């Protein structure tokens, strides 16, 4: 069998995500339906081939504007070096990118921003839990730090739920605007809107 040809055909024909043996086939359209039913505004294929992990993005975390740097197992430095993060994602060939879009009264509508962020995290966790059943090795990267626990156990004790923990795309060094562009979707949908973006590495 010509394995190079087989890999080429799988890459060229994104009709679904093929899982061999006793596992199932879940098509992109099915993933879209699941994501839309959960509440995501947009669900598309993630262009994994173009993902770059940038030191300058990781450095933005170190400025600690979100007050989570060094305080959460999902954030730097606990989530690993960029080299370790690159090793994490290198084993994946397929993924999806998802978005939640909110409407704002004006550019100073902080309440609307927080409501959309909370809604996105709710969608994200539901999608993670749903996909985990189909893809046991799922890697989920969200928007913002992990909020599974009211207070993270870092650094005093091990993570309480390592299988449910998730890091952000930025923690892994991804420039979200670039990932969106490379995956063929918008990052900004115009005045009066705000969008939160996450991604799932499936296999």
Q: Model-derived features: where do they sit?
A:
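Short, Lys/Arg-enriched N-terminal segments with co-localized hydrophobic residues
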Residues: 9-25
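Catalytic cores of enzyme domains
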Residues: 28, 41-72, 76-203
């Amino acid at each position: 069998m010509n394995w190079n040809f087989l890999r080429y055909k799988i890459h060229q024909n994104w009709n679904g995500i093929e899982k061999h043996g006793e596992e199932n086939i879940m098509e992109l359209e099915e993933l879209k339906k699941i994501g839309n039913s959960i509440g995501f505004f947009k669900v598309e294929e993630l262009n994994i081939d173009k993902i770059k992990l940038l030191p300058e993005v990781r450095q933005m975390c170190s400025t600690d504007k979100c007050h989570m740097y060094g305080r959460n197992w999902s954030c730097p430095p606990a989530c690993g070096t960029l080299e370790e993060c690159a090793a994490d994602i290198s084993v994946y060939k397929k993924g999806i990118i998802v978005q939640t879009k909110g409407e704002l009264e004006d550019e100073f509508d902080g309440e609307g921003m927080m409501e959309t962020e909370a809604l996105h995290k709710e969608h994200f966790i539901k999608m993670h839990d749903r996909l985990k059943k189909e893809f046991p090795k799922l890697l989920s990267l969200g928007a913002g730090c992990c909020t599974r626990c009211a207070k993270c156990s870092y650094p005093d004790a091990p993570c309480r739920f390592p299988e449910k923990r998730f890091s952000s795309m930025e923690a892994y060094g991804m420039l979200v605007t670039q990932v969106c562009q490379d995956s063929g979707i918008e990052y900004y949908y115009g005045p009066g809107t705000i969008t939160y973006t996450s991604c799932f590495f499936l296999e």
